[in-house]
């Protein structure tokens, strides 16, 4: 999609083929006695809703993890080590807060925990829409740590609550289904956000190109300054185009983070419909009992 465009025949054909195979896969799974993915888990509303929220969160999360290294290494000139070190504190925060978030899940339930975590994540993602070529390294690290702090209250509690909403006989099937959907959503999110970045970069590059009118006195002054530093007009134009390319790419990344923020807002809205732990468990037991009667 990044090279051909979403409206190209090749991409539309692949989408159509993918949808057809998904439909065939669902039909086959529903007819099998021992399916690869047991779709019976979708009969339980809390599991279904938490799975959808997980997928929407993954749309935002995975794409963001791809965009930041592109910004840091390709545009700002940081090494792969520096890029990894920037992301490291966020990962540590998630690991350290995981057990604490699990205890809070048992105490206050999933709904307030998820709303808090996704709200923090949404704010931090929005802050990443303001990147420029001079954004301090430590500022970016702080924003990413804040984003990871919010994620710590979402990831494990959301998975735990989803599995707890199922009867014991379906727990393993629910775990397999949830992990599959999370990975799928992460891949889709990466594709969407990278495509937004490349598409918007092209548009911004075109807009900046129109502003670089050589008859503009301001542009002429800058060209003369650059020409004196880089050995003539050709060197000056090369440096100027490199800078404009970087500037357009930064704006494209910011636009992609806007889309990631929208995904986070959607997840936040969906959290408002979550049930309490007790109600979700009671609903699961009732549905399981009804299904057992129907099977008999």
Regions found by a protein language model. Give the residues of each.
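Short, hydrophobic transmembrane alpha-helix segments
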Residues: 1-5
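12-transmembrane solute porter fold
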Residues: 7-17, 21-206, 259-260
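Hydrophobic transmembrane architecture of multi-pass small-molecule transporters
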Residues: 182-276, 281-296
């Amino acid at each position: 999609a990044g090279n051909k465009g979403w409206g190209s025949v090749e991409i539309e054909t692949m989408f159509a083929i993918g949808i057809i195979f998904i439909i065939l896969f669902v039909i086959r799974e529903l007819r099998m006695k021992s399916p690869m993915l047991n779709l019976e888990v979708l009969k339980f509303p809390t599991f279904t809703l938490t799975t959808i929220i997980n997928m929407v969160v993954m749309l935002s999360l995975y794409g963001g993890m791809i965009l930041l290294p592109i910004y840091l290494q390709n545009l700002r000139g940081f090494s792969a080590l520096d890029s990894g070190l920037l992301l490291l504190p966020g990962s540590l925060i998630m690991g350290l807060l995981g057990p604490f978030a699990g205890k809070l899940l048992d105490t206050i339930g999933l709904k307030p925990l998820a709303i808090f975590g996704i709200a923090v994540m949404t704010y931090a993602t929005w802050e990443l829409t303001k990147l420029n070529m001079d954004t301090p390294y430590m500022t970016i690290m702080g924003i990413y740590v804040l984003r990871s702090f919010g994620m710590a209250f979402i990831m494990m509690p959301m998975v735990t609550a989803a599995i707890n909403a199922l009867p014991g006989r379906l727990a393993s099937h629910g775990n397999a289904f949830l992990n599959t959907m999370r990975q799928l959503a992460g891949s889709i999110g990466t594709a969407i956000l990278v495509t937004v970045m490349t598409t918007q970069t092209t548009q911004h590059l075109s807009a900046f190109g129109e502003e670089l009118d050589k008859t503009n006195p301001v542009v002429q002054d800058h060209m003369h300054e650059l020409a004196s530093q880089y050995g003539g007009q050709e060197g000056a134009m090369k440096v100027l185009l490199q800078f404009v390319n970087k500037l357009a790419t930064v704006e494209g990344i910011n636009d992609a983070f806007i889309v990631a923020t929208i995904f986070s807002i959607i997840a936040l809205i969906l959290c408002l419909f979550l049930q309490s732990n007790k109600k979700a468990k009671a609903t699961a037991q009732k549905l399981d009992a009804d299904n057992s009667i129907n099977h008999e």
